[in-house]
Amino acid sequence: GTLLVAWWQREAPFVAWQMLVIDAQAYALTLLVNDLTKWASGRARPWVRNGDCATNRDSPSCGGGGRNLSFYSGHAAVTATSAGLLCAHHTQLSLYQNDYLDTGTCVLAVLGTAVTGAMRIASDNHWASDVLVGHLMGYASGYLLPTLLYYKEFRAAPHEHRDSLEYAALPLVGDGVLGVTLMGLF
C-alpha cells in the first residue's frame, strides 16, 4: 500500500523504489537473523512441553521439524518489521500528507503485530519471551535500522569542530577474546 501511495498518489516512483529496497533489506535481515537464532537456540515450543508430547513423545501431534524452533517468533518478527517499516515511511515521509492518517496507519500496524503475537502465544506455538524478542528484533530491523540509515532526522550531522571528547564503550568479541573496547571521537 505505501509503495502505491508514494508512486501514484505522490507521483514519486523513485521514492517508491527506494522504499522497496529499504523494505527488502529489512525483511532480509529479519529472516536471516531469525533463522540463525532458531537453529542455534533449538528451544522447544510450548506444545512440545505442555501438550501431548510431554507425556507421549510418539503422539502424531509431536511430529514435524518445527518442534524445537520456538525462539524467537518469526511471525512476531516479520509483522513487527512490517509495522516498523510502515511507521518509518509514514512518519518520515508523511505519505498521506495528513498527520492523523500517517500516525493512524502506524498505530494500526503496531496493533496488528500485537494481535499476531498474542495469537502465537494463545495457540501454544511460542512462549511469551519468544514473541517479545521477535517484536523487538522486528521493530529494530523495520523501524530503527531504516530510520538511522536512511532518514536524516535521526542521523547525526557532521561537526566541523568538536569542543569535547565523545566516547562509547563497545563490545569486543573475537577468536578467544571477549571484552569491552573504548572508542572516541575528538
What is the predicted role of each segment?
Residues 1-8:
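Long, hydrophobic/aromatic-enriched structural stretches that serve as scaffold segments
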Residues 9-13:
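Transmembrane helix-loop-helix
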